[in-house]
Amino acid sequence: MTDRKNGLTYADAGVDIDAGNRLVDLIKPMVRATARAGADAEIGGFGGLFDLKAAGFTDPVLVAANDGVGTKVKIAIETGIHDTIGIDLVAMSVNDLVVQGAEPLFFLDYFACGKLDPEVASAIVAGIAVGCREAGCALIGGETAEMPGLYKDGDYDLAGFAVGAAERGTLLPGRDIAAGDAVIGLASSGVHSNGYSLVRKIVEASGLGFSVPAPFAPVTTLGGALLTPTRLYVKSCLRAIRETGAVKGLAHITGGGFTDNIPRVLPKHLGIRIDLSRLTVLPVFKWLARQGGIAELELLRTFNCGVGMIAIVRRDAVEQVVDVLTQAGERVAPLGSVIEASGDRVVYDNHLDLAM
């Protein structure tokens, strides 16, 4: 084959294969550290493998979820803090799996950028690996797409894909959810990964930079505080499901807040009544509400307001479920109950405490 000395190369077009290979070398140890029963977490092949029998399943139903982290990546890019956004990526998908009673088994990521920086990408994958280990799932593959002309240099986007399993007959929500069941809330770690277009607009209007001390948490920067990773609820919720047998349903509070997410796990004839005075509203939400002049109902439909997961449990087992979740490291509060729906599916009593 003739080698044209002056011919164009892929690198001339902006795609650096050598940088991609360097990235693979950097992340292999991180990926290997996520190995679990059923997967060796080795990368480099054309596909990742998972052995359900080795993982201990006998009659499993597979559950899949995928998600991203929205414009939270813009804050990571602008601050240069890339080592936590991968935790968000994992959490957004695996929290959706546990809502259905499934144990996360494996995860795959998609990373797209304009110009590949192996150090930045490896920092992101390091966060993904942390999230996978905490969720108990193996990182078995992914895609790195360098696309000059589509993304600006320095910009990137992420998507994650998770697959879990539950034994047949154990999936949530249960068919026995009924009026009178108790509703408890599991505390969030912060804004998590939803509503960041509004967050960024509020920060811009405030005139503050991401490097200044956070008005609601002066011990850290505003950017660092807003990049607090999404909480992973997998191990605590699976423990509560398995040890108590009293968890009838779970709702991951993401985009749409309480208003749109809770009805997704309820039969159509049922709703939920929440006492807002029982919510411990995190300082970040108080600041956003005040700085942005956000109405209470808008706040409840946009952000988690301090509760990242809702559990619907048997009324007679509330104390047992709360004890298990607390022992697993969760901060839990009773919020209300399931009701017969006669209009709005989510009914709010009292008001959020938004005083700074």
Swiss-Prot record:
<keyword id="KW-0963">Cytoplasm</keyword>
<comment type="pathway">
    <text>Purine metabolism; IMP biosynthesis via de novo pathway; 5-amino-1-(5-phospho-D-ribosyl)imidazole from N(2)-formyl-N(1)-(5-phospho-D-ribosyl)glycinamide: step 2/2.</text>
</comment>
<keyword id="KW-0658">Purine biosynthesis</keyword>
<dbReference type="InterPro" id="IPR036921">
    <property type="entry name" value="PurM-like_N_sf"/>
</dbReference>
<keyword id="KW-0436">Ligase</keyword>
<dbReference type="GO" id="GO:0004641">
    <property type="term" value="F:phosphoribosylformylglycinamidine cyclo-ligase activity"/>
</dbReference>
<dbReference type="InterPro" id="IPR036676">
    <property type="entry name" value="PurM-like_C_sf"/>
</dbReference>
<dbReference type="GO" id="GO:0046084">
    <property type="term" value="P:adenine biosynthetic process"/>
</dbReference>
<comment type="similarity">
    <text>Belongs to the AIR synthase family.</text>
</comment>
<dbReference type="Pfam" id="PF02769">
    <property type="entry name" value="AIRS_C"/>
</dbReference>
<dbReference type="GO" id="GO:0005524">
    <property type="term" value="F:ATP binding"/>
</dbReference>
<dbReference type="InterPro" id="IPR010918">
    <property type="entry name" value="PurM-like_C_dom"/>
</dbReference>
<dbReference type="GO" id="GO:0004637">
    <property type="term" value="F:phosphoribosylamine-glycine ligase activity"/>
</dbReference>
<dbReference type="GO" id="GO:0006189">
    <property type="term" value="P:'de novo' IMP biosynthetic process"/>
</dbReference>
<protein>
    <recommendedName>
        <fullName>Phosphoribosylformylglycinamidine cyclo-ligase</fullName>
        <ecNumber>6.3.3.1</ecNumber>
    </recommendedName>
</protein>
<dbReference type="Pfam" id="PF00586">
    <property type="entry name" value="AIRS"/>
</dbReference>
<keyword id="KW-0547">Nucleotide-binding</keyword>
<dbReference type="InterPro" id="IPR004733">
    <property type="entry name" value="PurM_cligase"/>
</dbReference>
<dbReference type="InterPro" id="IPR016188">
    <property type="entry name" value="PurM-like_N"/>
</dbReference>
<dbReference type="GO" id="GO:0005829">
    <property type="term" value="C:cytosol"/>
</dbReference>
<keyword id="KW-0067">ATP-binding</keyword>
